């Protein structure tokens, strides 16, 4: 077994997902009202994590750079990424984290995010084997995608507020893909 200090850390930010089959890797993220879904296929030895800001739906505006903020888009990308790495849909299992109510005056988007993730996974037939959602404080999450081990650390009030500020920033513009062609 690899020691925690020797683990290869891969940080996931809002709007991203990663799929790995490296037993020495740990995925990490910091969550406020955002949700991270951690999925894996224990037989194929592959797993991944996403980090979404808003639940989204078939009627949500999910085009351009904004698509990566929505759970509906990132859940599909994560599942497809796992399947491309040899996972089978019927063996996938999930853990869900985040969805805190970080500001009392805002609508509870964190609760909506968590409910979306649970419903999406139920609709896809993917069992949720663990979750930690809600509350009033953010959390730092670590997930070992091959073993499925997860660990979270609660954030202090000040850390939660910094996370809220990051979550409210506009999405970063998408960088062109290296193989793209720009027309004038």
From Swiss-Prot:
Enzyme Commission number(s) of this protein: 3.5.1.44
GO molecular function ontology, one term from the record: protein-glutamine glutaminase activity
Keywords attached to this entry: Chemotaxis, Hydrolase
Catalyzed reactions: L-glutaminyl-[protein] + H2O = L-glutamyl-[protein] + NH4(+)
InterPro entries cross-referenced by the UniProt entry: CheD-like_sf, Chemorcpt_Glu_NH3ase_CheD, Cytotoxic_necrot_fac-like_cat
GO biological process: chemotaxis
HAMAP family in the cross-refs: CheD
Family per similarity comment: Belongs to the CheD family.
Function of the molecule: Probably deamidates glutamine residues to glutamate on methyl-accepting chemotaxis receptors (MCPs), playing an important role in chemotaxis.
Protein's recorded name: Probable chemoreceptor glutamine deamidase CheD
Organism expressing this protein natively: Rhizobium johnstonii (strain DSM 114642 / LMG 32736 / 3841)
Record gene name: cheD
């Amino acid at each position: 077994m690899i020691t925690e200090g020797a683990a290869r850390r891969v940080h996931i930010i809002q709007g991203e997902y990663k799929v790995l089959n490296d037993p020495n890797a740990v995925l990490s993220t910091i969550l406020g009202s955002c949700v991270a879904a951690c999925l894996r296929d224990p037989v194929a030895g592959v797993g991944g994590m996403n980090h979404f800001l808003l639940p989204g739906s078939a009627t949500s505006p999910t085009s351009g750079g904004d698509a990566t903020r929505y759970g509906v888009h990132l859940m599909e990308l994560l599942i497809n990424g796992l399947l491309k790495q040899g996972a089978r849909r019927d063996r996938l299992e999930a853990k869900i984290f985040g969805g805190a109510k970080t500001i009392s005056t805002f609508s509870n988007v964190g609760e909506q995010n968590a409910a979306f993730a649970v419903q999406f996974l139920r609709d896809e037939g993917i069992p949720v084997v663990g979750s930690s959602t809600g509350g009033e404080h953010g959390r730092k999450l670590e997930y070992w995608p091959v073993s499925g081990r997860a660990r979270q650390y609660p954030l202090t009030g000040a850390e939660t507020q910094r996370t809220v500020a990051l979550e409210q920033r506009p999405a970063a513009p998408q960088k062109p893909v290296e193989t793209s062609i720009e027309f004038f």
